[in-house]
C-alpha cells in the first residue's frame, strides 16, 4: 500500500520532517517515491513552517495513497492557512 507520511530529518533536538510518498513496508526514513512537502515544527520568525505540493498530493490520493493521521492534520492546517 502506498502511504503519504513524514520522514524525520534534521539534527538532534531540531526535528525537520519531509512529507514523502512511500510504500508502507519501507522504514520511516527509508526509500521513498517522491517528496511532496516539508514540515518544520521549530520554525521561528518568518521561516516557512509547512509547505505542501497540493497538486502532487491530489495526484497521489487519486491513485490510492493513504494519508497518515499526522499528514492529514497538517494538510488540513495548510488548507486553512491558505484560505486565511
From Swiss-Prot:
Gene Ontology MF annotations: structural constituent of ribosome
Family recorded in the similarity comment: Belongs to the bacterial ribosomal protein bS16 family.
Record InterPro entries: Ribosomal_bS16, Ribosomal_bS16_CS, Ribosomal_bS16_dom_sf
Lineage of origin: Bacteria, Pseudomonadati, Pseudomonadota, Betaproteobacteria, Rhodocyclales
SUPFAM superfamilies, A to Z: Ribosomal protein S16
Keywords recorded for this protein, A-Z: Ribonucleoprotein, Ribosomal protein
Gene Ontology cellular component annotations, sorted alphabetically: cytoplasm; small ribosomal subunit
GO BP terms, alphabetized: translation
Name this protein carries in UniProt: Small ribosomal subunit protein bS16
Cross-referenced Pfam families: Ribosomal_S16 (PF00886)
Species this protein is from: Dechloromonas aromatica (strain RCB)
Keyword Ribonucleoprotein carried by entry: yes
Amino acid at each position: 500500500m502506498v502511504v503519504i507520511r513524514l520522514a524525520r530529518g534534521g539534527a538532534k533536538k531540531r526535528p525537520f520532517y519531509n512529507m514523502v510518498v512511500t510504500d508502507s513496508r519501507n522504514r520511516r526514513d527509508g526509500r521513498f517515491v517522491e517528496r511532496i512537502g516539508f514540515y518544520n515544527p521549530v520554525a521561528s520568525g518568518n521561516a516557512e513552517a509547512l509547505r505542501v505540493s497540493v497538486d502532487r498530493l491530489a495526484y497521489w490520493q487519486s491513485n490510492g495513497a493513504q494519508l497518515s493521521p499526522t499528514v492529514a492534520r497538517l494538510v488540513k492546517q495548510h488548507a486553512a492557512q491558505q484560505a486565511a
